[in-house]
């Protein structure tokens, strides 16, 4: 046994203990089973040479376990046998913004691709996050869209018809037992200039392999009321990079998170490239319990501080004047009005800067190569001859913070 393996096994053994100020989170590898969790949940996985396969999710608060029958790795983008697998554990202390957490890193190499899966395990949280990093060379599978109309599909009469599918790179995967799953996906939209309906939900029964859009997937067994959720930590579906057309794939009780947010050329041989993240959480009950579990995870990412997280904002773009009105005199007058209205944050939108965006009231604006213009994000000397100092000083006097687009 190598020295490296001895160190890894030693770390695996000690991290079952509450060594970090009583924080109850753990991750350890024992035999062929990798376990990680806290007071709320545990995720158990077959080690599989460093390409873990989930075998169960346990809800410790209710004493219930969702068994899995996985054969494929949770994360899979290339074929091959994993080698050079390692497992390490580190505590990441709080930085004043996020809560402290245990980072369990599973690394392996498949062919010319190095993979690191960095799990984030928070105390007293019914969810475990995973950030994935890639380095080396990879040729990602390009899915050819099936453009057939549903009217052109034949009936399912034979087992072979049900086995058809596509190769799908997966961020995470739960290959579960049971035949009574009910699911709901939530899709979000941005670009409020174009969208006034920012959230849509779809409830569905998993059946034959199908795809779904959204950043959230909730699923529960309608008999046992045991449930789990996937949170895809990525932009909204309509604005993701290299979007494959969906975020989730379900095939009966096999649930997958898809869409890495990268292309093959984004993976470099000498630096790590991070793909979109994924969070897996558990709950028992209905919608309230599911949303509570999700919220408990979200509260780990950012400590709530009223001074910085709560605000009543006034924005200079609000009357659709674009950048035509914004200047020093206008902003000083707006601050007086903001104080009378109880505004706590005055936000200077597009137009305060020297660079001209394509949204300008006057022609000639552009975002092209703006990083090459070192003066782009400096105060416009014509509109703000004294810089932003008079605006900031008056804001402080009135108890109003100043924000910038």
What is each residue range found by the language model?
Residues 2-4, 94, 231, 393:
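Generic cytosolic/nucleocytoplasmic N-terminal low-complexity/intrinsically disordered segments
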Residues 292-301, 385-388:
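Alpha-helical scaffolding within the catalytic cores
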Residues 23-296:
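N-terminal accessory beta-strand-rich subdomains and adjacent acidic, glycine-rich linkers
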Residues 17, 265, 270-271, 396-405:
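Short, intrinsically disordered, charge-balanced linker/junction segments flanking boundaries
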Residues 1, 133-143, 354-362:
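Short regulatory "switch" loops immediately downstream of catalytic or recognition motifs
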């Amino acid at each position: 046994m190598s020295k490296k393996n001895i160190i890894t096994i030693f770390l695996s053994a000690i991290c079952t203990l509450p060594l970090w100020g009583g924080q109850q989170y753990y991750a350890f590898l024992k035999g062929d089973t990798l376990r990680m969790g806290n007071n709320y949940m545990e995720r158990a996985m077959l080690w599989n040479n460093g390409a873990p396969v989930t075998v169960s999710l346990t809800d410790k608060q209710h004493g219930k376990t969702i068994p899995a029958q996985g054969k494929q790795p949770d994360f899979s983008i290339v074929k091959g046998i994993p080698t050079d697998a390692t497992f390490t554990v580190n505590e990441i202390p709080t930085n004043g913004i996020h809560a402290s957490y245990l980072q369990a890193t599973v690394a392996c190499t498949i062919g010319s691709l190095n993979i690191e899966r960095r799990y984030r395990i928070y105390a007293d949280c019914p969810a475990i996050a995973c950030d994935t990093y890639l380095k080396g060379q990879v040729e990602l599978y390009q899915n050819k869209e099936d453009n057939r109309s549903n009217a052109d599909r034949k009936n399912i009469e034979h087992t072979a018809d049900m086995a058809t599918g596509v190769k799908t790179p997966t961020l995470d995967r739960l290959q579960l037992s049971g035949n009574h799953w009910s699911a709901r996906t939530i899709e979000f939209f941005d670009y409020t200039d174009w969208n006034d309906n920012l959230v849509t939900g779809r409830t569905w029964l998993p059946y034959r392999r199908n795809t779904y859009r959204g950043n959230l997937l909730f699923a529960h067994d309608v008999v046992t009321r045991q449930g789990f959720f996937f949170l895809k930590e990525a932009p909204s579906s309509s604005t993701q990079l290299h979007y494959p057309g969906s975020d989730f794939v379900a095939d009966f009780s096999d649930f997958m998170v898809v869409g890495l947010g990268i292309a093959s050329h984004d993976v470099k041989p000498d630096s790590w490239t991070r793909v979109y993240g994924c969070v897996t959480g558990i709950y028992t009950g209905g919608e309230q319990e599911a949303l509570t579990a999700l919220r408990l995870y979200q509260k780990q990412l950012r400590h709530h501080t009223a001074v910085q997280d709560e605000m009543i904002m006034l924005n200079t773009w609000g009357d659709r004047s674009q950048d035509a009105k914004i200047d020093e005199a206008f902003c000083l007058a707006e601050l007086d009005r903001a104080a009378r209205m109880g505004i706590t944050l005055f936000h200077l939108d597009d137009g305060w800067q020297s660079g001209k965006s394509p949204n300008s009231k006057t022609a000639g604006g552009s975002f092209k190569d703006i990083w090459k213009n070192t003066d782009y994000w400096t105060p416009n000397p014509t509109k703000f001859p004294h810089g932003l100092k008079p605006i900031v000083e008056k804001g402080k006097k009135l108890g109003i913070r100043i924000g910038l687009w």
